[in-house]
């Protein structure tokens, strides 16, 4: 997805430090950032925020973190948080490679990866969010019962991710090869998921855990 540059977005985000972390000011202090101490769930690459804001509204007993590096998109998540009055959702504007700078070991209960960039060229494999270096970060910050939820329309990325996770020592608790045909009604659509689904694209989904989180 090509993101149109918004020169004003950085200043707009900086005007809301209570909701947006742009400079690592809350690194290592995620729990203290929220009004209540509750389980923490993260979505990495939140896009415009439809998925994460819907989750936060439905589950006030869980604290959510939206992690998105594109400032020109993050402002849309911020607008939704403000409009919906969500107190259990915060935003980190940074790259996922910095995860362990923000979260303590075992601090997170769930990670969502929705429609991540597939980086189809082999030479770019290390940029995929299911590459082993990212899996190592997830393992570090997830608690013993924590899990990873992954969703994509890209069959190649899904196959790669299944293999990458298996080789890393993860196991799968759920695999859907055609999510919308098998959906039990609990699925929350992202903006892109609706677009892909309307075009007839198949949606793939999995839930996975580490055999040993530490």
Swiss-Prot record:
The active site is at residue 117. GO terms for cellular component: tRNA methyltransferase complex. Catalyzes the formation of N(7)-methylguanine at position 46 (m7G46) in tRNA. The gene is trmB. S-adenosyl-L-methionine binds at residues 43, 68, 95, 117. Pathway: tRNA modification; N(7)-methylguanine-tRNA biosynthesis. This is tRNA (guanine-N(7)-)-methyltransferase. Its EC number is 2.1.1.33. It comes from Staphylococcus aureus (strain Newman). Keywords: Methyltransferase, S-adenosyl-L-methionine, Transferase, tRNA processing.
């Amino acid at each position: 997805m090509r993101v149109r540059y918004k020169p004003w977005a950085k200043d707009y985000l900086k005007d809301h430090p209570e909701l947006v972390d742009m400079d690592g000011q809350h690194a290592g202090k995620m729990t203290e950032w929220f009004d209540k101490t509750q389980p923490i769930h993260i979505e990495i690459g939140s896009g415009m925020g439809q998925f994460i804001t819907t989750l936060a509204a439905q589950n006030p007993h869980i604290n959510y973190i939206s992690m998105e590096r594109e400032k020109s998109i993050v402002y849309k998540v911020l607008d939704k948080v403000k409009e919906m009055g969500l107190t259990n959702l915060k935003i980190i504007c940074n790259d996922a490679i910095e995860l362990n700078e923000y979260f303590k070991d075992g601090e997170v209960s769930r990670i969502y990866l929705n429609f991540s960039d597939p980086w189809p060229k082999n030479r770019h494999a290390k940029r995929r969010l299911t590459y082993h270096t990212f899996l190592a970060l997830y393992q570090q910050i997830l608690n013993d019962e924590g899990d990873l939820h992954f969703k994509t329309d890209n069959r190649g990325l899904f196959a790669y991710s299944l293999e990458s996770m298996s080789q890393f020592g993860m196991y799968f608790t759920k695999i859907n090869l055609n999510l919308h045909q098998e959906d039990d009604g609990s699925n929350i659509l992202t903006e892109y998921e609706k677009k892909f689904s309307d075009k007839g694209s198949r949606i793939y989904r999995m839930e996975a855990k580490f055999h040993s989180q530490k």
